[in-house]
Design a protein with these regions (language model features):
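Conserved alpha-helical substructure of the radical SAM core
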Residues: 56-203, 207-208
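Short acidic, hydrophobic short linear motifs in intrinsically disordered regions
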Residues: 38-52
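Acidic, low-complexity/disordered tracts enriched in E/D and polar residues
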Residues: 1-35
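Radical SAM enzyme [4Fe-4S]-AdoMet core and its adjacent flexible, acidic
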Residues: 63, 221-237, 244, 248-351, ...
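C-terminal accessory region of radical SAM enzymes
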Residues: 305-338, 368-415
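Radical SAM/AdoMet-radical enzyme domain recognition
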Residues: 135, 139-155, 164-288
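Local cysteine-cluster metal-coordination motifs and their immediate loop/turn environment
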Residues: 108-118, 366-369, 403-420, 474-481
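Short Fe-S-cluster ligation motifs
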Residues: 139-157, 394-396, 432-476
Length: 483
């Protein structure tokens, strides 16, 4: 399968299954578009009609171009066969090794964000803080079910996890003890709204957290529209100075500023640029997922505006990078030479199998977005996964589980998309959230274009970097099995 598009002056041709990316001139772009369904003579005739007035386009040149395309096809870099579909059906037989937990240490929050999917941190239930006993058992559950995997991921989540900070510190200390006993390596992430950040929090996170996610929606008026406290006061003035101090002290350790855009700020690139201008360089901005009819929900009329915004963002990122003031955007971070291995590209995030969420009471759910839905209660941290039907359902959830994805060029980049978004949009985890698909495909086009621009600049310096699918992923490089 081949996908062709034009963006920022580049003619880009992507071969889906090999991962090869080709940057071609106008003539080659049109030849590739006709190649599969036309004879060489038909292609030459059509191209001469279109480009015949150009002195640099002759029939001989066109036939050479066709031969070059044929060579790429024979080399498996254009219209390469899809040899991965059978792998998708093997996943149901894989042993279930748990690699990561989203630990809901607080089902309460000190903000009252009206667009919050978790009903202001309560997940449509009672407010609660996780006890150390539950947290300790959750870590034991993870160790017991991780098999030979050494690197384990834990995300302290809420609600607002800093409302249970003392327990978090105690739990991390316990995990550090268990690492030595079981030959494990815990990588912690903290997701916080920033209100309770102080020197103690900063020092702890910079010592113990592999990554930190800091919630900010961008410009003051945008952030404060939704991210308010219970007295109705916006959080921007409170959290921005704290985030700046946090990031300054964090040095070269991982962090992300994470925002949400809604119908009210479809010009969300201005919020990203605002965060960059505040000094933040690791940025993410996610589309809100709301019920239809919600005032914040994205509409069909918003879609072309949003796609244009992603293009504006990509072009500005290239410009700022050349000026020495670049920043990272999470959804544009792709590695086209050594990225995720094919098992990961097919199976996605691993929710419901390798990754689960744990409530303050120790219940297990496929991920944080299913918490509180009795249909997706999988078991608990004492008895383990008892609702194996849910786990089996998620084992089948992959890039080949949806018939609509069969002929989609982006399927090996999205892995079939987010199961939770599909469920909330269609009622099925193997449904298709079409709005999200459109945004994802535009993000991928922009991300690939940025890589093309980077490679063009390297080529100008005499450095050639081929863009095609690598054979290993970061997990493999860490000595972990992806299968």
């Amino acid at each position: 399968m081949v996908h062709q598009y034009q963006l920022n002056g580049y003619n880009i041709v992507l071969d889906t299954c090999s991962g090869s990316v080709h940057v071609v001139d106008d003539v080659a772009y049109d030849v590739i578009a006709m190649y599969q369904d036309h004879t060489a003579d038909q292609i030459v005739s059509a191209m001469m009609d279109k480009y015949g007035s150009r002195p640099d386009v002759t029939e001989e040149d066109l036939r050479q171009c066709i031969d070059d395309v044929t060579s790429l096809k024979e080399a498996g870099k254009l219209w390469s066969p899809d040899v991965y579909e059978n792998m998708a059906f093997d996943f149901k037989n894989r042993s279930t090794v748990v690699k990561a937990l989203c630990l809901h240490v607080a089902h309460t929050c000190n903000l009252s964000c009206s667009y919050c999917f978790a009903s202001q941190g309560r997940y449509h239930g009672d407010r609660a803080l996780m006890s150390f006993e539950v947290g300790k058992r959750a870590m034991d559950f993870l160790i017991e079910n991780s098999g030979t995997r050494r690197n384990l991921e834990v995300d302290f989540f809420g609600g607002e996890p800093l409302m249970n900070f003392d327990m978090v510190k105690k739990l991390v200390a316990y995990c550090r003890e268990q690492e030595k006993i079981h030959n494990k390596n815990f990588r912690f992430t903290m997701t916080t709204n920033g209100v309770l950040i102080d020197d103690d929090v900063i020092d702890f996170c910079n010592k113990e957290c592999h990554n930190v996610v800091l919630s900010l929606d961008g410009r003051k008026e945008v952030n404060d529209r939704f991210r308010k406290d219970y007295a109705g006061r916006g959080s921007y003035d409170t959290i921005v100075p704290k985030f700046q101090e946090f990031v300054k002290k964090r040095g070269d350790k991982n962090y992300y500023m994470r925002g949400t855009y809604t119908h009210y700020n479809t010009d969300f690139t201005n919020d990203i640029f605002h965060m960059a201008d505040l000094g933040f360089t690791e940025l993410s901005m996610e589309p809100v997922v709301s019920k239809p009819g919600d005032p914040s929900a994205l509409t069909a009329e918003d879609l072309p505006i949003l796609k244009e915004q992603y293009e504006i963002l990509a072009k500005e990122m290239i410009k700022r990078d050349r000026e020495g003031r670049g920043f990272t955007f999470y959804h544009y971070m792709i590695d086209l030479t050594g990225g995720p291995c094919i098992s990961t590209r097919i199976s996605g995030c691993g929710s419901g199998t390798e990754y689960m969420a744990v409530t303050p009471w120790g219940d297990l759910y496929p991920c944080h977005q299913f918490v509180g839905d009795p249909k997706y209660l999988m078991g608990d941290i004492w008895k383990g996964v008892t609702n194996t039907a849910v786990r089996d359902e998620f084992k089948h959830c992959n890039a080949y589980a949806r018939k609509e994805c069969k002929d989609c060029w982006a399927k090996l980049y999205c892995s079939g998309g987010c199961a939770a978004n599909s469920y909330h949009a269609t009622g099925s985890i193997t449904g298709v959230y079409e709005y999200g698909c459109e945004l994802f495909k535009k993000r991928m086009e922009c991300a690939i274009m940025i890589k093309v621009a980077e490679n063009q600049e390297l080529a100008a310096q005499g450095i050639e970097v081929p863009i095609e699918l690598g054979s290993t992923c970061n997990a493999c490089a860490d000595g972990e099995a992806c299968e």
